[in-house]
Design a protein with these regions (language model features):
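Charge-dense, intrinsically disordered terminal/linker segments
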Residues: 1-25, 32, 48-50, 58, ...
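Active-site neighborhood of HAD-like aspartate-dependent phosphohydrolases
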Residues: 19-70, 159, 169
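Short His-Asn-centered micro-motif
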Residues: 27-29, 81-84, 102-105, 147-149
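A structural signal for well-ordered alpha-helical scaffolds and beta->alpha junctions
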Residues: 33, 37, 84-87, 111-116, ...
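Short, acidic loop-to-helix structural element flanking the phosphoryl-transfer center
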Residues: 71-101, 108-113
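Substrate-recognition "cap/lid" segment bordering the active-site pocket of phosphatases
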Residues: 102-145, 151-155
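Acidic, Mg2+-coordinating phosphoryl-transfer loop and its flanking beta/alpha structural elements
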Residues: 145-179
Length: 182
């Protein structure tokens, strides 16, 4: 026969609420969950590192011209990007902590719609904040973790008092998160 305390314990174990954590997780999209580099290379025929050589204006100019040549809207480009090869694994681990996506839109406002569509298709009901890269740091605090693939965003986040985790692979990110009990 069940005691009331046994039933309470069982119900508590079955709870679907997020595990208690003292940390708020913010996760970037491009280069962490979403494979922007692969999408860019498939679209333009050029690797994304050419931005470092040619400059951002030519990088985005090539992007826009390729979209026009292939008759693809910027909204559709962003909405149809693929997961990073290990992006789902990372998401499956952090989703229980109710993370917020913190992503920088491109120069074209249509990227905002495309990113929202991607989230709705792949991870519905996930909060999404679209902020310029230099504004991400405004969400930092001592209990806020940012997972991002850009060192400049991590440095800004850390300088603003947050905990930045430079994402190079899911394995290394999960290892770093484990140090915070996540």
């Amino acid at each position: 026969m069940y005691k009331l305390t046994d039933l309470y314990k069982q119900l508590k174990e079955e709870s679907t609420e997020a595990p208690q954590s003292q940390y708020k997780i913010y996760c970037d999209m491009d280069g962490v969950l979403v494979d922007f580099d692969k999408g860019y290379q498939e679209l333009t025929g050029k690797p994304t590192h050419h931005a470092d050589v040619q400059g951002k204006n030519e990088f985005w100019g090539t992007f826009k011209q390729s979209l026009q040549d292939k008759k693809i809207s910027e909204k559709d480009y962003w909405a149809n990007l693929q997961w990073m090869p290990d992006g789902k694994e990372l998401w499956d681990h952090i989703k229980q902590y109710k993370p917020t996506l913190l992503s920088a839109p491109s120069r074209d406002p249509q990227s905002r719609w495309g990113k929202r569509i991607w989230v709705k298709k792949h991870i519905p009901n996930t909060p999404l904040i679209l902020a310029a890269a230099e504004a991400k740091k405004n969400y930092a605090n001592k209990n806020a973790i940012l997972i991002d693939d850009r060192i400049s965003n991590i440095n800004d986040w850390n300088a603003a008092g947050g905990i930045g985790i430079l994402h190079t692979s899911t394995a290394t990110t999960l290892d770093k998160l484990s140090k915070y009990g996540i």
